[in-house]
Amino acid sequence: MRDLKTYLSVAPVLSTLWFGSLAGLLIEINRFFPDALTFPFFLIRVIVAGRGEKD
């Protein structure tokens, strides 16, 4: 029973920290790239990879 009490007290704290940090990360990404459907750093990799430069 003590293990169940420990689990029930730790899981909400960990999930709150996890979702809080995830929300903060998404807020910061949205601050630097507002209203972005695609993010430029992914697009740059696709453009560079699609050039087909050969040695």
Curated annotation (Swiss-Prot):
GO terms for biological process: photosynthesis. Keywords: Chloroplast, Membrane, Photosynthesis, Photosystem I, Plastid, Thylakoid, Transmembrane, Transmembrane helix. The chain crosses the membrane at residues 7-27. Its main location: plastid. It is found in: Plastid, Chloroplast thylakoid membrane. The keyword Nucleus does not apply. Belongs to the PsaJ family. May help in the organization of the PsaE and PsaF subunits. PANTHER family: PHOTOSYSTEM I REACTION CENTER SUBUNIT IX (PTHR36082:SF2), PTHR36082. This is Photosystem I reaction center subunit IX. It comes from Gossypium barbadense (Sea Island cotton). The gene is psaJ.
